[in-house]
Amino acid sequence: FPPWKDVNIQSEKANTPEAFALAQLPNISAWQKTTDMFGPIPYKKAGEPIMVVPYDSQEEVYNFFFEDLSAAIEVLTPKAEQNLKLLPNYDAVYRGDVVKWVKYANSLMLRMAMRIRFVDSAKAQMYAEKAINHTIGLMENKDDEAKMERGAGLVFVNNIETLANQYGESRMGSSMFSYLVGYEDPRIESYFTESESQYAVEVFNGRKYQAVPTGHVYAQNDTYKEFSMAKVEKTTPTYWMRASEVYFLRAEGALIGWNMKGSAEELYKRGVEMSFEENG
């Protein structure tokens, strides 16, 4: 939190609120994943110079998310409408492209809205439609994807590659194998490597794969050495969000009657098409 707090302080001193608004986006994105995994977290008072930081309920945390995200979008929108660049030499995600940052922010708002729709449908619909009706809009194209990779002085290594190749701890699971093979999904070649194991299964495309059966746990990682693993390299980007997810979120919203600027069927099909485009 100290670096994030420092950005806020320096942004206020320099009268550049857009710098802190930009910093809010990866901050909210990371904390959203954290609260979805662990529930209540210290958020509003996190980073304060106090001995005991109070936890906020997940409902409170999401309310803070929506407030902070809305404020950030409000600050960044005029910059996006002027097609200005912001901190391009320090931006490893969008190289300073504020239009894409605002599209990401709106898409993040849609994702968060969909996460709360079973507990507060009215609020979820309000924020989802707010995101889609924004003047800059949402992610719609492959180039809109938010991804971390080398750049802006960042030494980046894909963490899945580290888990799979360096630690030997990440391999294809049987559920994923079942879906991809059962639907004869050609993206399996983009997602996973072939297996040279004598137990590998030849599938519809003539290639062989081996997956870890659900519930099987072995003490030694070497047991899984020849199983199919994620097809990533050290330089493969880590994706925060892609346009295909946004289309699927819109399809879900349309399915329950929200105004998502398209029918559920149209948006779902576009999501599938976009996923194929994203994965070659």
Listing of model-derived features with the role each one plays in the protein:
Residues 1-279:
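Structured, solvent-exposed acidic/aromatic patches
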